[in-house]
Amino acid sequence: MGKQLLILLGLLLGLQAFSANTINPDKVYDSSIKTIRVYPVGNALAIPVISLSQMNPLEISFDDLKAKYQNYFYSVELMNADWRSANLSVFDYLQGFNQNRITQYSISSIAIQRYYHYKFTFPNSNCRPTKSGNYIIKVYKDSNPQQIVFTSRFFVVDDQVSILSSIQEPFDGNISKTHQKVQLSVETKKLSFFQPDQIQVQVIQNYRYNDALRVNTPNFVRGSLLEYNSERDLIFPSGKELRWLDLQSFRLKSDRILNFEATANGTIVNVKPDFSRATTPYFIFKDVNGQFLISNSESIDSDNQNDYATVVFTYVPPNRLPLIGETLYLSGSLTNNMLDETAEMKFNAVTRAYQKSLLLKQGYYSYAYILRDKAAPNPMLDFNETEGDHWETENAYSIFIYYRPPGARHDHLIGFTTVHSNQY
């Protein structure tokens, strides 16, 4: 018994030591890990949100290109609204075990690129959350939390408020045709003894967490109704319908593919060069708002039969000259919406264009090109020069309502919804 207790304490200390150094809730630490997906069972395009009352499960899956069995485990950690650790004992927010082995896996069958496909659902009979809030899931090898391979975020909501929201044109004539304003009301009848500034609103556009907008004070309080309708707080550049790439077949070229190259190591897919759309007219096109779907037009088992290819993206800048003072990124779930070297486009002096190669699994992808000012510490991402901004664009806005009750030690997620602008 004493030995078991020491082992348990060691595991808990290891998890806490890792969490103390964890900042990014979506990070891949092992380059052989690909196609990480975390979503509600049955809806691969939805935000990974669990209802505290219903315990609807998430499916978590990933591929390991090392193509040999690995002994993977997972654990979860409660975070605050700013994605810093809540620093609570796991016993305060979790029922069951916080170190669980991933037992469901399969081996790729007809794909040239060999891989192991792992998946599991959460919550499950071994582990379930007892508190609402932000969470990260950590997957690691050999029951050692120091051998982390990736982290990914998810949410647990305890619905205590109702949200009424809409997307409006800003009143400011300078941005009314290029931006969209999120306007919302939060009904708080179920809450008691709270101050309006204890409520925090966060809004993200098209599943990008790295440029979320936050509001801590409502514009109006009408009884139990909090209204947020400022002309400056929740305004987003509209962008355009995102670019798309159909990789469901490596034999038949879709409209966006320039050519295929068959090599001994697999397939290379060269995407047709992309150019700025800043001055092109807006047209309606139903996209998946930066998400991707794993599918295959020639097989029935996408998890295990879909192949991988090296996909080469090319962006041709104006005048074919390098951008001065700005960094160009490939944005979308295909790069995990990261703003780092995994998504950064590099200028090729020979082709006089920016290029980025990604190893992608067969499926359907949507993406955009974004700019970031190198001199600005934390700027809003700029789509205007590469994509253009049009009020008519359909975008997905996910709204999170957080509450820190008096005496509480972490931020509770008490409301969530997703609303679409100009849905066609």
Give the location of each predicted region.
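Bacterial Sec-dependent N-terminal signal peptides
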Residues: 1-22
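Long, internal scaffold/assembly segments composed of regular secondary structure
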Residues: 200-283
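Contiguous beta-strand segments within globular domains
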Residues: 29-78, 175-186, 298-314
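Ligand-binding face of N-terminal immunoglobulin V-set domains in extracellular IgSF glycoproteins
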Residues: 112-142
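Aromatic-rich carbohydrate-binding modules that target alpha-glucans
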Residues: 95-118, 209-218, 312-362, 374-405, ...
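Basic K/R-rich, polyanion-interacting modules in nucleoproteins and related proteins
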Residues: 271-324, 413-424
